[in-house]
């Protein structure tokens, strides 16, 4: 039986594994995807907002070419962290069920089962996109993740969303030769759009280089076109790809199945003790961005790295 199983092999999950090892705990880090799966799914040319030192874990220095590292450098860094600490990892193994036992918990996965005294959920949010729930969303042309602009050259691309991701995708695909239309539920772009980018997208929309439908939603998607509802009524647009940058959310289903409760607030914030990170279920802890519920801009790598030590000290002290 493990002392602790950490679900999620992102930066905070790895930090938890490191702190568990330092505390002398018998631990396992398990993830349904690859190492730092969320970072792997970032756009290929993405640069972090944070400087490299703020992304460091486990006393392993993060040296990047620029002041702020890119995706490639981050993947290299976290591989180096996992290797240098020889972390006990099981990747590409999805947890399908968690049951309480007399001594703790049993985690059932696609490959087997593991017994543990405690659990840390460090599952982040990037693996679970908000779905539009419209006919045709399951077509191959619909993407909830964006990697690079090249495939969209010369294509009619519909970008859904009003926040930073949607704006970045619209501008980048437009500049690489796509015919871009934005579909935005809100009456305007969100105030959270980066201040140095907002004038660019507003000017492109104003001049007509990028078309934008505000107060509008996608109704149905077909192979070569998409229906949208606008304030002026329904419209059918020719379309090759839909890039749904609608945001992401934590895996609430997993938390609820484990008995974790939630506050009655707009962010569906999970219940946990901020001093120990322990949830309302004794023996189950939260770490990282998952702590914020739907407020996914509250916790980042740089301000939640400390969760790992707090959790492991709480577990060690019983």
Residue ranges with predicted function:
Residues 137-151, 248-298:
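FAD-site-proximal beta/loop scaffold in flavoenzymes
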Residues 123-176, 266-275:
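Glycine-rich dinucleotide-binding loop and its adjacent helix/turn
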Residues 86, 90-99, 107, 113-115, ...:
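A Rossmann-like FAD-binding core segment of flavoenzymes
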Residues 5-7, 114-126, 160, 238-247:
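Short hydrophobic core segments
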Residues 288-318:
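A conserved FAD-binding loop/helix module that cradles the flavin
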Residues 2, 9-87, 167-195, 264-265:
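Beta1-alpha1 glycine-rich phosphate/pyrophosphate-binding loop at the start
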Residues 1-3, 92, 153-156, 215:
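Phosphate-coordination loops involved in phosphoryl transfer and adenosine-cofactor binding
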